């Protein structure tokens, strides 16, 4: 066997590998002898099938096994002998005629292409200064949260006879939608509650129910939006024939002890305490997220080294595919969609490079600090993942147990969080008082 490094550019390596026919045949003979004792063929005693017969019947398949195993072993040996850490699975470019190799007429020769991990020394995280924003919880914020709870528990009471509907009212209505005089599927309902101003119906529907009274009938002239999900309705004008059964006015409950008791609590004071605790948890989560972002920015600025091209390409493809899905779903801003594709690709490749760089830095910091994940932590994450698929929990768990790549993806964010926690515990952390709005403002990638 001959293994020769033929290329070393940046983090890319190429090895030329050649295995003579004689070595392949020797390994095939060894494989045949390995399986002969277990073979059962008609006309032969158990375990006594002649090697020549086994070669004749199964030689082709067995040689395929030999080649696959030999390629894997050779690749691993080449990396170990050259003290290289692969940044992904090596790519094999077969140079020989594989048909001739399998039949023993030609040496096995191929090229192995592999990206290797960069060598770098991470910054001493104890020298970093991380800014952690904090915000006080004001009584006004608690009051706003309580108001949202009250709104969620709002009840609607019938308006007085002859009283017209107003914005915010719930109108109980029957309707039949028609296009060109023909009723269409999904356009009919009875005793439907329509909250005016909630914008849950197509534009113009709720607005035209303002001022109606119980017992009235009214035609609503509307047009479906051009981007309406049902393609057969998109952009078309429609008429909804409606019959008003009842007009109900919203009644916001009083925020007092009785309201709290209705929620299973003892008093309004206890409810305020629970709301404050919830807000505190939200602040803690947002504060850590901001501190993590500052930490990642500082790590990114402190490191400059070559990145494995394959890792960057893979990360970019994932980001790009996600962007395409977001565009298809209409969740991308007009400003973003207006950019030339080349500009977008440049921007998102920089994001991919940042993610790969930070992933490598965090992994090295974690290795040096001996950060580890416990099986209990992995199991908890697995349970959380399984619970997202009610009724299929067992199948989800089995999927992860049988798929190392999926399990690695499950472990990755757990490990990252533990490394981030380690850095936040080691670095100097300065608290900065900000407003709640600043604390929850979204960061750009």
From Swiss-Prot:
- Which Gene3D superfamilies does the record associate with it? 3.10.50.40, Trigger factor ribosome-binding domain, Trigger factor, C-terminal domain
Q: Which GO terms describe its molecular function?
A: peptidyl-prolyl cis-trans isomerase activity; protein folding chaperone; ribosome binding
Q: List the disulfide bonds.
A: none
Q: Does the keyword Cell division apply?
A: yes
Q: Which UniProt keywords apply?
A: Cell cycle, Cell division, Chaperone, Cytoplasm, Isomerase, Rotamase
Q: What is its EC number?
A: 5.2.1.8
Provide a GO CC annotation, any one. cytoplasm
Classification via PROSITE patterns? FKBP_PPIASE
Q: Which HAMAP family match?
A: Trigger_factor_Tig
PANTHER family associated with the record: TRIGGER FACTOR CHAPERONE AND PEPTIDYL-PROLYL CIS/TRANS ISOMERASE, TRIGGER FACTOR-LIKE PROTEIN TIG, CHLOROPLASTIC
- What is the protein name given in its UniProt record? Trigger factor
Species the sequence originates in: Hyphomonas neptunium (strain ATCC 15444)
């Amino acid at each position: 066997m001959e293994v020769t490094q033929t290329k070393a550019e940046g983090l890319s390596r190429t090895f030329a590998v050649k295995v003579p026919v004689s070595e392949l045949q020797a390994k095939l003979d060894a494989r045949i002898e390995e399986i002969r004792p277990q073979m059962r063929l008609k006309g032969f005693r158990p375990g006594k099938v002649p090697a020549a017969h086994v070669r004749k019947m199964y030689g082709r398949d067995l040689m395929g096994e030999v080649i696959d195993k030999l390629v894997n072993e050779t690749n691993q040996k080449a990396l170990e002998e050259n003290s290289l850490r692969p940044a992904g699975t090596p790519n094999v470019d077969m140079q020989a005629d594989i048909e001739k190799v399998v039949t023993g007429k030609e040496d096995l020769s191929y090229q192995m292409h592999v990206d290797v991990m960069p060598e770098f020394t991470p910054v001493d995280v104890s020298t970093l200064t991380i800014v952690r924003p904090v915000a006080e919880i004001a009584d006004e914020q608690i009051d706003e949260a309580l108001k949202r709870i009250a709104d969620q528990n709002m009840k609607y009471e019938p308006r007085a006879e002859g009283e017209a509907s107003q914005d915010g009212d719930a109108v109980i209505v029957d309707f039949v939608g028609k296009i060109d005089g023909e009723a269409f599927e999904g356009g009919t309902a009875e005793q439907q509650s329509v909250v005016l101003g909630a914008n849950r119906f197509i534009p113009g529907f709720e607005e035209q129910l303002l001022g109606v009274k119980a017992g009235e009938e009214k035609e609503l002239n509307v047009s479906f939006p051009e981007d309406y999900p049902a393609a057969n309705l998109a952009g078309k004008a429609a008429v909804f024939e409606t019959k008003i059964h009842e007009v109900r006015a919203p009644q916001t409950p009083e925020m007092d002890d009785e309201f709290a008791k209705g929620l299973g609590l003892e008093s309004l004071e206890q409810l305020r305490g629970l709301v404050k605790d919830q807000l505190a948890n939200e602040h803690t989560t947002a504060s850590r997220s901001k501190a993590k972002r500052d930490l990642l920015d500082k790590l990114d600025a402190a490191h400059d080294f070559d990145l494995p091209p394959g890792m960057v390409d893979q990360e970019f493809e994932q980001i790009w595919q996600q962007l395409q899905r977001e565009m298809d779903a209409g969740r991308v801003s007009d400003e973003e969609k207006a950019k030339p594709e080349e500009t977008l690709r440049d921007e998102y490749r920089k994001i991919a490079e940042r993610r790969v760089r930070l992933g490598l830095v965090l992994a090295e910091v974690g290795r040096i600090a001996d950060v580890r994940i416990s099986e209990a932590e992995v199991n908890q994450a697995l349970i959380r993942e399984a619970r997202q698929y009610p009724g299929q929990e067992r199948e989800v768990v089995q999927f992860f147990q049988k798929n190392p790549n999926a399990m690695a993806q499950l472990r990755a964010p757990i490990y990252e969080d533990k490394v981030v926690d380690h850095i936040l515990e080691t670095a100097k952390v300065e608290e900065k008082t900000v407003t709640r709005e600043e604390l929850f403002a979204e960061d750009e990638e």
